[in-house]
Amino acid sequence: NDRGCHLISRLKGKGTQTVLLVAHVDTVFKRGEAAKRPFRVDENGFAWGPGVGDDKATVMEVIYGLAALKEAGFEDYKEIIYYTNAEEEGGSPTAEGIVAELSQQADFAVIMDVARPNWGIVTQRKGNAKYKITVTGKGGHHGNASQCCANAIHQLAYTITELHKLASPMPGKPEDFTAKALEARGIVDSGQFIPPNTVNVGVIGSTNDKISVIPGDAYCEVNVRCFEVAEQKRLDAAIKALADKIVIDGTKVEVTGGIVTGPMEKTPAVQKMIDVYSSVVAEEFGGKVNEWVAGGLTDGNRTAKFIPTLDALGVENYDEHTDHESVDLKTAVPRTAAFAITLAELLKTGVK
């Protein structure tokens, strides 16, 4: 389309299993950024440039990994589908439709996105829901008409406190869970402190801008994220039920929106994928895989709706989405080899 080229590549084999590999070729940067900061490799073996790790290096990892399997004569698969998404960063109906269609043609998916440090992979991701809560009341003069008005902001304030009750408790004081604070305490952050269910009232407003006027309208926009499908559904029902919880007579609450994208859950099939990758890393490289959970979304959330999914098997990257993003090229060969060996094993044995 006019935003990029969505490329779907297919390899036919002689086996029974089909895998969907997903990477992306777009970046968060505007056109012309590469001319300002062209690709370069420094003396320490780090590559630099816009999108160098998210997700350019990993796009190449897949190509070299598949080339190695082909050179080795590996054909124990039904089909390998490799989709490079041109609109992953911003999302689009085009990309989401392609991912959904291809997922239903495969037995499992591997999302080739940015890896976490020290053999880190992502085994769970939160799902995403969005809501708009609109309160309609009756406005009027605060001094003379309070008795015949209905304050929409007061009702919204109550509704927001009810929203807050749906969220999981925070692990402690915010200042104790920054990257620096965890590092100072000798704790490796792998997302383990992310609360299971989070509710964020990110936007709030009213047409009223006078404190002497009782507001007749108010609204807020809410983002909800959960690690589990069951919890996502539970919160969805609870939020929609807030329309019936009126504490200010004369007001009406309307809740619109709902679940947008489901979580990427860690199922028994996903655990098998993790076990295979962990064995490969240990046996071939003497490494230990670190499992991460993430509150952000990737195409892995969309494939997980249909098939077991493992995420973030790319090359190790630092400071993505910034002008100092870099890739540790020393991880390229080990990561590519581990990916290829794991892929071959999963295609031979299946994931269920």
Residue ranges and their predicted role:
Residues 23-25, 52, 85-87, 112-115, ...:
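Fold-independent oxyanion-binding glycine-rich loops
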Residues 114-115, 123, 129-352:
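Metal-dependent amide/peptide-bond hydrolase catalytic core
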